Amino acid sequence: QIKAISDSFTQQYGKALSVQSVQRSGPNNATLEVEYEKAVATIEITTEASPPFKVAGLLAKGFAVKGDSIDKIKTDFGALSGTSGFVVQKLSDDGVATLHALNADKQFATGSTFKLYVLAELASQVAGGQRRWSDVVPLGVRNHSSAGTQNWPLDTPVTLQTLATWMISVSDNASTDALMRELGRDAVEGKLATIGHSAPDKALPMLTTVEAFALKSNPTLRQRFEKASEAEQRDLLASERAALSYGAINMSQLGSGPVAIDSVEWSASPQDTALLLNSLRRTNSQTARDIMAVNSGVGPTAASKWRYLGYKGGSEPGVISMSFLPQSKAGDWYASSGSWNNPAKEVDNGVFVSL
């Protein structure tokens, strides 16, 4: 499997020429910068703990393509199969300046990017005195793709800050749904109106991750949901709780390509997400921004070029989205968000990351 990953890098970026740097991040982990003929890759590598210390994990965090330019990036974005778009903005308290954009107003499935709305609402409730980051609640939720809390007992006590950190840094789904439960779906949905969203009819009702998995894996229930009005969809979510629970998810229905990415999803345009990023910049919650910076999305070498780098991504078959909130060493703030959707086949995450 690792050879297949390495071969895919070579096929796309040419031969590996040299290892430019190695930064140790743990007893068996390191981040490497590897120069290829066409790009410089940031790669996280994990070895086994005992001799002969075989490579156990290999993760590409980003590719800096040689000779890149914004015009080339736009051309490459436009050549992607399906639909794609992005926006890059400079942010200030005096206004927002769009520097570069392509299909920035088009709605895309964005996967876990919606979790930034959950973070924004949590920060608002803490700022309003309704909650504290240190408040302790039971986990109470189980779901797939929950790297932080997988197999934890349901009565495990966790702070809201811990849940938020898992939710953003490793996209933990159980943590997300626990926060949705505590904050309230209506309150999180209210962030779309407060911050601004160009097509709330496509984004509401805002599903929990369990609901999304369950709907995607149940064709009969999904078809009912797709044909329903928003009010009817809300009634369905309330009346079909057993069918929309973790135990009802049929993962065998989710392993063969994109499923309902146009109808059972979290929808936003790059411009919508840029508004959300700017709102998180302007909030008085340093804790929320610290949480966004736990996982920079690009590795420590690329992140070190910025004073601050907040990140959230989202992906599933047929969907990838990446959003950044960077602050330059000079103090200037930016928002960058891009998405790529293809309802007919899986997208190439490596290609998108390189853009």
Regions found by a protein language model. Give the residues of each.
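Short solvent-exposed beta->alpha transition segments
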Residues: 1-28
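Exposed beta-sheet edge and beta->alpha loop/turn motif
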Residues: 25-71
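Second-shell loop/turn segments in exported
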Residues: 31, 63, 101-110, 148-154, ...
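Beta-lactamase-like hydrolase cores
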Residues: 61-109
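Structured C-terminal helix/loop/strand segments within mature extracytoplasmic catalytic/sensor domains
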Residues: 62-80, 251-355
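Active-site SXXK
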Residues: 109-137, 167, 336
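Short, glycine/proline-biased beta-turn/loop segments that scaffold the active-site neighborhood
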Residues: 128-156
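Active-site-adjacent helix/loop patches that line small-molecule binding or acyl-intermediate pockets
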Residues: 154-246, 271
